[in-house]
UniProtKB/Swiss-Prot annotation:
Required co-factors: Mg(2+)
Note accompanying the cofactor annotation: Binds 1 Mg(2+) ion per subunit.
NCBIfam families for this protein: PRK01117.1, purA
Catalytic activity from the UniProt record: IMP + L-aspartate + GTP = N(6)-(1,2-dicarboxyethyl)-AMP + GDP + phosphate + 2 H(+)
Subunit-level organization: Homodimer.
EC class of the enzyme, as a word: ligase
GO biological process: 'de novo' AMP biosynthetic process; IMP metabolic process
Location(s), subcellular: Cytoplasm
Record keywords, A-Z: Cytoplasm, GTP-binding, Ligase, Magnesium, Metal-binding, Nucleotide-binding, Purine biosynthesis
Residues the record lists as binding substrate: T305, T306, T307, G308, R309, P310, R311
Entry-linked InterPro entries: Adenylosuccin_syn_GTP-bd (IPR018220), Adenylosuccin_syn_Lys_AS (IPR033128), Adenylosuccinate_synth_dom1 (IPR042109), Adenylosuccinate_synth_dom2 (IPR042110), Adenylosuccinate_synth_dom3 (IPR042111), Adenylosuccinate_synthetase (IPR001114), P-loop_NTPase (IPR027417)
Family annotation (PROSITE patterns): ADENYLOSUCCIN_SYN_1, ADENYLOSUCCIN_SYN_2
UniProt-recorded name of the protein: Adenylosuccinate synthetase
Length: 436
């Protein structure tokens, strides 16, 4: 049976949650393999809106198993809150539906404080972090001083590890607070230990060796869907560094972050909006600073799920999509929010860049070069029809069909899914990755 990775092909917020929710019908297991609660997936099912930050989107489907892999950094309080909220609404009736890797790393209060105060200290060169402690938690992981989910279940071990890490974190916080003129937050071992052992008890029924579970599912031929967070251009290695997140968002990390071998993955499906958005700092060649940009933001409800920050909006960037295809090995692409373009008289697609008088077809590796490029646009005619009721490709207005086909040509990736509204049902699935 094929196993499929769903990955963001832009700077995140592409609509991955909706596509994963749609494809979960055909999968048996859904895996989150990187990031933390800096990601937010918004799902609308039957007009009811659900926002998830850590638990995979497939949890809204009864009988599906959702896994939070070892590559995720977990804020236990946020996770417990999501579990409780889902149960109140009638989801997650069986605890066996959710597995948390015992090797996933944990976000502690000092991580969030360091994240916020470091960002404040950057001033005008701020990266745009969410302040959720994601980066500092990954930093501790790589420095081999991190605390994992398994440690929450052993109070003595947890105390030892908090005592080993907290003093250095407090020293840095004192320096940062002195620079900012702020009081130093009070962090003490007994309070942190009590809180996190309590959270560990709440999470204990869900904690497992996720790698062992998933390898067993692969052997049994289960269909597994890997749910990426953020997007390709936010990848710590392949994104617009340093304006990136702290994890690998590309498809290659799906195996590493879930504890499987790379041969377990069969197809990679990229997700792209019909236009482009970005949150926070960093280069954005097709960004619009005009009424059209404002219209895209308003009609697309482009405000961060996690932070509420307004997203920067611009035209679709074919150079970015070609790059995403290259580094992820895209089998196909879902084009989301096509309905947001309804009513625009003309549309533009960036097909290449101009850099220092030269035409550039590929994404520059240096973010300073990317900040200097000028987009080369191709203009297409728009459409006036509202398309939320469309359920087949042939029902789309002719100009909408031409737009989709041109996106395929510019990106080099077939469009296998088109989203025409926020609800799960407002989708045209042209090819099912689990069947074709």
């Amino acid at each position: 049976m094929p196993n499929v990775v769903v990955i963001g092909a832009q700077w995140g917020d592409e609509g991955k949650g909706k596509v994963v929710d749609l494809l979960t019908e055909h999968a048996q297991v859904v895996v989150r393999f990187q990031g933390g609660n800096n990601a937010g997936h918004t799902l609308v099912v039957g007009g009811q809106k659900t926002v998830l930050h850590l638990i995979p989107s497939g949890i809204l489907h009864p009988g599906k198993t959702c896994v939070i892999g070892n590559g995720v950094v977990v804020d236990p309080a946020v996770l417990v809150g999501e579990i409780d909220a889902l149960k109140v609404r009638g989801f997650l009736k069986d605890d066996a539906q959710l597995l948390i890797s015992d090797n996933a790393h944990v976000i502690f209060p000092w991580h969030k404080l360091l994240d916020s105060f470091r960002e404040k200290a950057r001033g005008g060169s701020a990266i745009g972090t969410t302040g959720r402690g994601i980066g500092p938690a990954y930093e501790d992981k790589v420095a081999r001083r991190g605390i994992r989910v398994r440690d929450l279940l052993n109070a003595d071990r947890l105390r030892t590890r908090i005592e080993a890490r907290l003093p250095a974190a407090l020293d840095e916080l004192k320096d940062l607070c002195a620079q900012a003129g702020d009081p130093v937050p009070q962090l003490e071992v007994p309070q942190i230990l009590a809180e996190f052992t309590g959270l560990g008890e709440r999470l204990k029924p869900f904690v497992h060796d996720a790698s062992l579970y998933l390898s067993g599912q692969v052997r049994r031929g289960a269909r597994i869907l890997f749910e990426g967070a953020q997007g390709t251009l936010l990848d710590v290695d392949h994104g617009t560094y340093p304006f990136v997140t702290s994890s690998n968002c590309v498809a290659g990390n799906a195996a590493v972050g879930s504890g499987l071998g790379p041969t377990a993955i069969d197809k990679v499906m990229g997700i792209s909006k019909a236009y482009t958005t970005r949150v926070g700092g960093g280069p954005f060649p097709t960004e619009l600073h005009d009424a059209i940009g404002d219209q895209l933001r308003k009609m697309g409800d482009e405000f961060g799920t996690t932070t509420g920050r307004p997203r920067r909006c611009g035209w679709l960037d074919g150079v970015v999509l070609r790059y995403a295809s290259r580094v992820n090995g895209l089998w196909g692409m879902a084009l989301t929010k096509l309905d947001v373009l309804s009513g625009l008289k003309t549309l533009q697609i960036c097909t290449a860049y101009e850099l220092d008088g030269q035409k550039v077809m590929e994404l520059p590796g240096d973010y300073e070069d990317l900040a200097r490029v000028k987009p080369i646009y191709e203009t297409l005619q728009g459409w006036d029809e509202q398309i939320a009721g469309v359920r087949t490709f042939d029902e789309l207005p002719e100009n909408a069909k031409r737009y989709v086909r041109r996106v395929e040509e510019v990106s080099g990736v077939p469009v296998v899914c088109v989203s025409v509204g926020a609800d799960r049902g407002e989708t045209v699935l042209l090819q099912n990755p689990f069947r074709s």
